């Protein structure tokens, strides 16, 4: 079977729902304890999920709306607080403290994040006042509507001591971020419809900006993928969530798709549990519209087992 573009269709696994009743889950991440953690935007909570039973428990309350998650080398959780543009740190006693104030270097809400093994956090922002525009018109689509022309945004590095540095500009809605074994940082540009790569230097600077994967025809029907959350899939491959088609695609450097997961509704974030075969975790919801997502609990965690890529 081939796609309309003539490419061989990638094998597709169908996900099953393991947890529902959420508002809008994002940033599925495996913690040092092996549990799965997600941010539920409109419940203002970080949830800890036991991957053996799929039971969820509140782990942190984030009134400013939680997003990206990661851990310092000592095991303390970092979580992006979107609306007040702070990076929070969960202490051993469960309290949240400010790890870094991002307000001076971000435009609009702070967004998704990746924390590397050295404890450096890499976080994007919206680039404009997305939520302010929606207050004026709750049904507007400031990102993809017919009159949408969002400005570009930045990527910020937060060092373990809380020092904040802008490391990249001109990104078209930087979203999910991950680091490959060779030191390549990959950033999903949602509005740009691509994955952009940088080389991370020893001192944490980003060099060699380049296109890692053009996703303009990478969808199941040869249509474009507007990448949201991403996760390392092993080697030079990345899982990419696809809100448009509903599901996730495993993308190699250069843009080839060699596996897909089909979900029951749009997929806004993806993670990987280190099982054999790998468990691909998809955060899905009926819509990303904040008004609708906050009013209804359509959010789900859906999973599928996908064998590792050959080679």
Q: How should each PLM-predicted stretch be described?
A:
Residues 1-13, 41-43, 148-154:
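Blade/loop signatures of beta-propeller domains
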Residues 2-23, 209-213:
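A short helix->beta-strand "capping" segment at the edge of beta-propeller domains
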Residues 19-36, 62-81, 86, 103-121, ...:
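Beta-rich, blade/repeat-based domains predominating
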Residues 41, 82-83, 126-128, 190, ...:
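Short loop/turn segments immediately following the C-termini of beta-strands
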Residues 45-47, 86-88, 153-156, 194-196, ...:
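A short loop-to-beta-strand structural motif that recurs across blades of beta-propeller domains
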Residues 50-54, 90-95, 158-162, 200-204, ...:
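Short loop/turn segments that connect beta-strands within beta-propeller blades
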Residues 123-150, 285-298:
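Short, conserved, GDST-rich strand-edge loop motifs in beta-rich repeat architectures
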Residues 193-194, 198, 213-253:
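Loop/turn-rich, solvent-exposed surfaces of beta-rich toroidal or solenoidal domains
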């Amino acid at each position: 079977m081939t796609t309309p573009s003539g490419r061989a269709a990638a094998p597709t696994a169908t996900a099953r729902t393991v947890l529902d009743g959420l508002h809008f889950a994002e940033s599925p991440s495996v913690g040092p304890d092996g549990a799965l953690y997600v941010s539920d935007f409109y419940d203002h909570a970080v949830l800890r999920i036991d991957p053996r039973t799929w039971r969820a428990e509140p782990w942190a309350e984030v009134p400013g709306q939680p997003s990206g998650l990661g851990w310092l080398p000592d095991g303390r959780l970092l979580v992006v607080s979107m609306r007040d543009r702070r990076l929070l740190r969960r202490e051993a006693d469960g309290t949240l403290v400010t790890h870094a104030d991002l307000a001076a270097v971000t435009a609009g809400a702070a967004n998704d994040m990746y924390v590397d093994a050295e404890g450096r956090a890499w976080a994007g922002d919206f680039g404009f006042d997305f939520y302010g525009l929606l207050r004026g018109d709750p049904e507007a689509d400031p990102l993809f509507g017919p009159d949408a022309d969002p400005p570009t945004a930045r990527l910020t590095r937060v060092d373990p001591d809380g020092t904040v540095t802008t490391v990249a500009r001109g990104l078209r809605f930087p979203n999910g971020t991950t680091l490959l074994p060779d030191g390549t940082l990959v950033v999903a540009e949602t509005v740009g419809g691509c994955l952009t790569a940088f080389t991370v230097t020893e001192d944490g600077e980003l060099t060699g900006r380049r296109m890692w994967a053009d996703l303009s025809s990478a969808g199941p029907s040869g249509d474009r993928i507007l990448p949201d959350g991403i996760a390392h899939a092993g080697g030079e491959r990345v899982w990419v969530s696809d809100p448009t088609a509903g599901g996730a695609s495993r993308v190699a450097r250069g843009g080839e798709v060699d596996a897909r997961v089909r979900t029951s509704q749009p997929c806004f974030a993806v993670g990987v549990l280190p099982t054999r075969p790998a468990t691909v975790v998809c955060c899905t919801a009926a819509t990303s519209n904040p008004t609708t997502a906050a009013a209804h609990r359509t959010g789900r965690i859906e999973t599928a087992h996908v064998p590792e890529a050959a080679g």
